[in-house]
Swiss-Prot record:
Major localization listed first in the record, in broad terms: nucleus
Miscellaneous section: Present with 18800 molecules/cell in log phase SD medium.
Protein name: Ribonucleotide reductase inhibitor protein SML1
Tagged with keyword Zinc: no
Region (Disordered): 43-62
GO terms (BP aspect): DNA damage response; mitochondrion organization; negative regulation of DNA replication
Location of this chain's protein in the cell: Nucleus; Cytoplasm
N-acetylmethionine: residues bearing it: 1
Tree of life domain: Eukaryota
Organism: Saccharomyces cerevisiae (strain ATCC 204508 / S288c)
A cellular component annotation (GO) from this entry: nucleus
Amino acid sequence: MQNSQDYFYAQNRCQQQQAPSTLRTVTMAEFRRVPLPPMAEVPMLSTQNSMGSSASASASSLEMWEKDLEERLNSIDHDMNNNKFGSGELKSMFNQGKVEEMDF
């Protein structure tokens, strides 16, 4: 007579033999690496700063970025003040407190 451990292994072998007939095949999608689209490099991470590891180089790059940002914000303010797309009227209505009179 076989011991219980041998019987357990015999059952497992039978299940393993039956398993391939009951399995389904699943097709998996294949993913490939693709290059990233070209993007503008952030001024703080530019190659010029990585070559010169001084803090002043990165600070000047940051200052240039902030100056450019300030110029763009000033340009937006200028456009708003010159009534581009009616925003000048909207701003004056808000400043005068005539929000209730506004017709949307």
